[in-house]
Amino acid sequence: MTKQILILLWAVYSITANSQTFEGFITYKTEALNPEPTMIPDSIWQQGVKEQFGDRTYMLQKSYYKEGRYTSEIDAGKEKGFLTYNPEDGFLYSWQENSDVAVTINTKTNTDEPIKIMDSKQLDTIMGIPCKSIIVKSDTGEMVLWYNTDYFRVNPKLYKKHKYGHWNRIMEKIGCLPLKTEQKKFMSHIVQTMIDYKEMEINDKIFQLPEFKEIINAK
C-alpha cells in the first residue's frame, strides 16, 4: 500500500495530459535528488534511493496521451505500477502490477493554494529541442517547467477542471506538455526529463481501467 501511495504522489511531479493535437507517448526519467545536501550526506541519500529504486536509482514513466486522456506505465525498479486519469469522474487511479487495489485522487480539487505562475529566464535543450520555462510557486514549494510550444500541444479547455497539480492553470499558460519538470518542496527535490517520445495512433483500450476489488481515496 505504501508503494501505491508513493507512486500516486510522484504523479504530482510527473502529471501530464494530452490534447486533440498530440497523440502518442512520452517517456520520462524521474530522479529524486538530495533536497538538503548540507544536512543529509549524499552517500546516505543515494543509499536510500537505491533501496527504493534499485541500482538504476531512477524511475521511468511511459505516458500515453489521446484526446484529454492519459495513462502511464511506471517502472520504479523494484516495483511496477500504473497511473490513469479518468476524465469521466475526474479521478487519478494508481495501482501496482498484479494488484486489484487502487488509490485515487480527485483532480477537481487542489489544496495547494494560492499559486503564482511567471515566465522564467531559465533555458534548456531536451533531446535537441530548445525549451524556455515557467515557474509555478505555491504555498508548499516551487516548480519549474521547460517547454516548447511547437511540440506536444494540448487543448487547455480539456483540462479546465483538472485543478490537481495546478494542471488547468499550467495548460492555460503554456498550452503544451512539458519536456522537463523540476519541483522543490520541503525535503523533496524531483527532476523529470523526457528521454523518448513518438507521435502515433493510440488504441482507446489502453485507457480502460481494470476491475478493482478495493478503491482507496487518498484525499
Locations of regions flagged by a protein language model:
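Bacterial Sec-dependent N-terminal signal peptides
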Residues: 1-26
